[in-house]
């Protein structure tokens, strides 16, 4: 096992090989741990290293950073794979004024504390890079939002860590006990923190009372009801977030979810991060998150109060400057939104506060003029002249709108019916009544009997999107002949701009929504893009709250669900419909002006048919050209031919190189064959000479057979190779000669090699 060292200056010099250098001149130092030993504590070893800028203490067992404050010039600190236990040790780096890079990966503090990165960014203001990742401005803002009111004492940091551990443990365990146990636990924990002298960043003391009352109210419910207990640290963070969001209401970016979707704000900091859920059904009931939220300024969630807090999705570039209260369920807004009139974002103002909405929801029948305080009524009144009949009818339309959209009393309904009865006998003068789709829809709603099929379709139309609802209202008005005769607009200069303005306000300028079958893949694409956006910009808990690079694209994606982009085929058909409608509109204008003859109408219709036919022919030609271009690309392209030539050139070059190598090998083989020829010739000559010598010895042996044996061994003669040749009387000489002849015959190469 590796040794553990308590670092001092002598050990530091030995490990860093600083035998002769002065400590004041050292600027970079690497003290990585190894199998031989690891540093356990640093102590006062760096007291004299005033100029040290880069320090590497990775792969050690350091548990305390006490003594790091002496490195006043330190810019880079690597504590990778150590044993830093808590945020208290991280706060010891605060006296380093020039620290820019810090690496604390694989330390226990990173694993245990969920808010470690935000705390490090908030504590070390000069930090530019943390854990090999750049520190973003959004992280600095989120850290400031979370820790702006926290103290710097070690006791408080320890308490924060304790609450973080409690939160981690209680997220894994579901408390099934009675809800009445919550209030004493929260109260006791708060009293304990107050006795320790800790600063609790609650905006006021009433939050504790509200928490107690909420817990008591929930305790009187059914015994089988389950309640999640949240630790004190989470409540403190929530209170801090609520107070700072109220103070910086105009500076911080607000979240405006579209209808039919619910964006749950991160009231509770869990390890899962933030959740974004899209709900197509109604409200899913209360959750423990909303049960523990303090409600000092709760708005009454009535049918009328929600009308002033709708979201305008007519223009994705403009958002209403009003903030939704976090207590009101956003599904309620999504359901009520379909019953309201979609106005342009630049014309809807914050004319009333929450008090006015509450008074309006409680007393709708005290004053009949109270309904004109709605933004629709203000808009219609401002666009009309109060002295003319047009202004009177517009005011009447606002009353009708309020009547059809509010739960009014019978007296107000009777008054409206009386005004409508007088309106049936009224013959409109030229230019006195604009053809407003909203007016026609409101009047059609009251004029039709309750049993008619068109009146039965109104609840189903309310569930549609605003753009589809607006178009169906317009088509219904144009399709109803009685209303068209009763409210047809005559020639006039004021009627056309006013009706066009109202049409643009209600999104009636051609913004049809595509069919549901075309919208389904669009929703899946938007969800996938939103998840990719979250993965790209998420840097820990609370990092997406103030990240404008994330909030802008996310808002556009969510708004595209309400007003999706139409398909190409659908857009082409709508363009044709728009051209036909424009021609019909021009035709009606010319008819009213008396400048158009019926023959001209027929000729214009024929021209329109010709134009449409030419459009079809041109589209077919475009498709044919695209097909020919595709086939030409598949058949061959000059760039492809060039590539093939290059490839062939490379192949030929490789073949030339191979042939050159083969030629070199052949030359070497020829040289080897020539050498073999010379060797063979010399061997043949030697063999012939030896055969001659053997024949001579055999002849001499036959003449000397009578000599004694000891004298029958004459001295050998010298051979032409400088070797003595033994007499033929020895049998070994004969055997040796035979072996030599045999070996030469075996060494003789094949005839094919000499050819």
Swiss-Prot record:
Listed A to Z, the keywords are: Coiled coil, Leucine-rich repeat, Repeat
Name the InterPro entries on file.
Answer: CEP72-like, Leu-rich_rpt, LRR_dom_sf
Compositionally biased spans, kind Polar residues: 721-731
Bias regions of kind Low complexity — which residues?
498-510
Residue spans of the LRR repeats? 51-72, 73-94
Basic and acidic residues biased stretches: 356-370
| Residue ranges constituting the LRRCT domain according to the UniProt record | 107-146
Region forming the signal peptide: none
Write out the ranges of the annotated region (Disordered). 354-374, 448-517, 701-755
Superkingdom of origin organism: Eukaryota
From the UniProt record, list the coiled-coil ranges.
601-671
**Which PANTHER family does this one have?**
HEAT SHOCK REGULATED 2, LEUCINE-RICH REPEAT-CONTAINING PROTEIN 36
- Name assigned to this protein: Leucine-rich repeat-containing protein 36
